[in-house]
Amino acid sequence: MEWASVPEVRKKAGVSEEDYTDVEIQEFISWATKEVNSKIITRYIRERIGFIDSYRSNKIDGSNTTYFVRNWLGKYLADSNFDNSIDVSDIKVVKLDRSTSTESEVVVSSINSKACSFVLSEAPSNCELYVDYCVTSVDPITPDSFLWQCTTYLAAGTSLVGNDGFDVKFGNVSIKPGKDGGKGKQLLTEYERLLDQLLVNINGGTAYGDMAEKI
């Protein structure tokens, strides 16, 4: 789950393999994906699992293992631990036995981002279930154009801009200050504009604006 490609970032930044290797560009993309993800997710902690509707009954009856989060409408389960992957590590489920006042974590076997559902390794009974998770209003698996563009511009801009005279490090990548900083600043400004529009779209505001291709 990384929302940019090495060729597109190279094209936007105007850098060659002599400037950055593919591995180094990929590190910019990985960092940019985490950063954009942090702007579009909403976190829910210890949400009690219970009946939602006839399809999402969330029965705790000793036979059911599939459950849905309450905040599912128009949402997708998201990357909550910022490893650029959406998997079972992004959800935590605990069961509470009121009779003994004991609590234990339940193993999650699989998750479905689009359905906002998850499958447990066991069918719980006689307990309460609670879940920690994150959701986003933008499909993180097949990202829309704004999500892709935001990440591309952020990765490209970051590859060109230093920070107050000091080297900036992202993983194994070291950015030297002042390297074509004018264009880098332009790219980051465009990223901020695209991110603002993306957040407006997510919050149900204006229709999609024009994509930026001029820089």
Where are these regions (language model features)?
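Short, hydrophobic/amphipathic alpha-helical patches that form generic packing surfaces
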Residues: Q149-D164
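Protein-protein interaction interfaces in oligomeric scaffolds
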Residues: F170-T189
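Conserved short "hinge" loops at termini or chain/domain junctions
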Residues: M1-F68, L73-W148, G162, T189-I215
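Short, flexible active-site-proximal loops enriched in glycine and acidic residues
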Residues: F166-V168
